[in-house]
Amino acid sequence: MKNNYTSLKSPIDEEDELKTDHEIDLEKGPLPEYDSEEESTLPPYSDHARLKNPPYTHREKNPSRSTDNSSPFLIKLLISFTSIILFNAPAVCYLKYKDAFFKNYGAAEWTLFGFWCLVCTLALISLTYFYETWTKAVKVTVISLAQCVKACGKGIKHFLKNWRNMIFAFCKSSLFCLVLLKAENELSSHLGDQQWGWKCSASAFTFMAVSSILIFIAETVEPGSCSTDLVKRVQAYCGYEARQYASSNTAIPLHEMNPENEA
């Protein structure tokens, strides 16, 4: 089958393409020879060539410029020394308060002081060398403590908001304790025996402590749960029993309602 393809380009367009092929880019320079048979070579000014040979950047001009943002050595040393001073400040203040700072030192005291200076020096070296590690640990600890304080503040606020009836709850529990103590004294004096009196006292105090705590919690969480609600429940129960009794007395028997069935 013959190829009947005919070019639609005019002779003028073909001359323009030949001119543009032979033009030289002033920025890129003349085109080097490209051998299409070699697979390893790439045509110049192509996208792959740009990826393999990235453009010259300003960062390559300064290869010695470091990107390390760590603190300088003197700042690390100063912060570590300040932390050691703050750690030793309470001991120095205590010695100043006792008026024993570098006074009447013997051989043992000077030996201990020298050992302590050695420990502080080693601590200073360690803190300076491991500066990033211990500062990060301090930051994490401070953040954790701040979160704990925030949580405790929310808990106290919730406690004060929901447990606002603490005074009345304390008064009710105290009144309950006084009544129970009076009953315990009467029972102990009535029994007379010391052994039984001691047992009654121990039982009464245990029951009083547990009951007062429960009453305090119940009255604080739900005010009136141990007094007002109890009275209301008793009144409701008594009213229910009265209604049941009245309904049972006023009920009409079936034979009175239907006398025809009886006949």
Swiss-Prot record:
Q: Name one GO biological process term.
A: meiotic drive
Sorted alphabetically, which InterPro entries does this protein's record hold? WTF (IPR004982)
Q: Which Pfam family is an annotated match for this chain, by its short name?
A: WTF
Has the keyword NAD been applied to this entry? no
- Record region (Disordered): 1-68
Q: Where in the cell is it found?
A: Spore membrane; Vacuole membrane
Keyword terms of this UniProt record: Membrane, Transmembrane, Transmembrane helix, Vacuole
Q: Which domain of life is it from?
A: Eukaryota
The Gene Ontology CC terms held by the record are:
vacuolar membrane
Q: Where is the composition biased (Basic and acidic residues)?
A: 19-30
Q: Does the keyword Lyase belong to this entry?
A: no
- Annotated transmembrane regions: 73-93, 110-130, 201-221
Q: How does it sit in the membrane?
A: Multi-pass membrane protein
What's the family?
Belongs to the WTF family.
What the protein does comes down to:
Acts as a suppressor component of the dual wtf meiotic drive system, and can suppress but not confer meiotic drive by compatible poisons. Wtf meiotic drive systems promote unequal transmission of alleles from the parental zygote to progeny spores by encoding a poison and an antidote from the same locus; the poison is trans-acting and forms toxic aggregates in all spores within an ascus, wherease the antidote is spore-specific and targets aggregates for degradation by the vacuole.
Subunit info here reads: Homomer. Interacts with other proteins that exhibit high sequence similarity.
Query: What is the name listed in the Swiss-Prot or TrEMBL entry for this protein?
Result: Meiotic drive suppressor wtf6
Species name for this entry?
A: Schizosaccharomyces kambucha
